[in-house]
Amino acid sequence: MSEIPIVSNHDLEKYVDRKVVIQGWVHGIRGSNARQFISLRNGGRILQVLAEKEILGEEVFQTVKHLRQETSVSVAGTLVKNEKSSVGFELIMDRIRIVGESENYPITPKEHGIDFLISQRHLWLRSSKQLAILRVRDNLSFAIRKYFHERDFLLIDTPILTGSVGESAGTLFSTEYFDLGNAYLAQTGQLYLEAAIFAHNKVFCYGPTFRAEKSKTRRHLTEFWMVEAEVAFAGHADNLKLQEDFVKTVIKETVQNSLQDLKVLERDPTPLLAYLEKDFPVIDYTKALEILKLKGEDIVWGDDINSEREQMLTMEFGGPIFIQKYPREAKAFYMKVNPDNPKTVLNADLIAPDGVGEIIGGSEREENYENIILRLEEEKLPVESYDWYLDLRKYGSVPHSGFGLGSERMIAWICGLQHVRECIPFPRMMERLYP
């Protein structure tokens, strides 16, 4: 077969009515005693291969007929157009070579429980639905980077191991670090992005983030990917404007590049895109509580707005909303205190509808040296561990703001999924560390 070009399912248009070789895996097979239809997976795409006894002969046809799911093969034949095919083409087989057998593949076409599928995640990735989800994830990742690069943001690779607490000390993964005491898996790259704005003005990072939250909800992972951005000379209002434009732009681009995959997922993106045609309402935390009380919720100032209450608010406003100016005691030390109400901070969470919940958290940062020391002391955090961070407030400090968005919740929203565990290749949850 070496004299015939070996092609990918991504390059089929160039080889219509030509002899080609396609290498891949048997995704499925069906047919009769005269012909078999193989779904051949290559490059994450499925190509239909037609195997006819009249062309192949009895012996080869019987080999084809008894192929098992996930057997790897090299198939030669003529590529023809077929508008009924998901990729628009079909391969008429004239030769086949088995590369690797597949015995007793555990994920058969029948229904399986989610616990079993998660335990077989290394194999479950091959299913049509999971193929589509991970392509959407890839498209989102591309759209995120494109958005920031087109607006002159610089990518900063922030450390995974850190000696500083970025969010809550109660959600840290800790490990001994030689003779230097404890190191922590990063909860955020934000503190390091703040250092970088003094060199580059507009920066972002995109990578894994770790939270040791003892939560088993459908919205939580202990390891997830977060994109974070930080901008010098930007206030709270600037930050909200950037976040809204970012979310609308990357969702639209991701959807446009994922239409076939969303079709596989039976996700109609029309309602999602409709949300993006309106401005996102901005309401104060205090106003949110007033609305919830009118709906019969027993909630007092200082209480958390849980996921159920978040969804009540998105339903009230008919789409995504920003909730801003949360109680100071409930938020991180680096958030700037609201000068109009010192009990609150200049922050906001973007809440997505459809059961998704918070997808962005952002704030204006405290730029004053004395104020941030007071906040560290309020949080009972060791000031000496933040010497380098405090230096940023001593040498040319400026107003600045930023935000972080969790990729998996965004993917769940775009794909219409009920759980974030399917939105990352190998999910890490409180009860799951394998495979």
Swiss-Prot record:
What GO molecular function terms would the record report? Answer: asparagine-tRNA ligase activity; ATP binding; nucleic acid binding
Q: What domain of life?
A: Bacteria
Q: How does it associate, per the subunit comment?
A: Homodimer.
Name the enzyme's class.
ligase
| Example GO biological process | asparaginyl-tRNA aminoacylation
Q: Name it.
A: Asparagine--tRNA ligase
Alphabetized InterPro entries for the sequence: Aa-tRNA-synt_II, aa-tRNA-synth_II, aa-tRNA-synth_II/BPL/LPL, Asn-tRNA-ligase, Asp/Asn-tRNA-synth_IIb, NA-bd_OB-fold, NA-bd_OB_tRNA
Record-stated family: Belongs to the class-II aminoacyl-tRNA synthetase family.
Provide the catalytic activity annotation. tRNA(Asn) + L-asparagine + ATP = L-asparaginyl-tRNA(Asn) + AMP + diphosphate + H(+)
Q: Which organism is it from?
A: Leptospira borgpetersenii serovar Hardjo-bovis (strain JB197)
Cellular location(s): Cytoplasm
Is the keyword ATP-binding assigned to this protein?
yes
Keyword terms: Aminoacyl-tRNA synthetase, ATP-binding, Cytoplasm, Ligase, Nucleotide-binding, Protein biosynthesis
Q: Which residues cross the membrane?
A: none
Indicate where this protein is primarily found. Answer: cytoplasm
Its EC number is: 6.1.1.22
Among NCBIfam families, the record links this protein to: asnS, PRK03932.1
Any single Gene Ontology cellular-component annotation: cytoplasm
Which SUPFAM superfamilies does the UniProt record give?
Class II aaRS and biotin synthetases, Nucleic acid-binding proteins
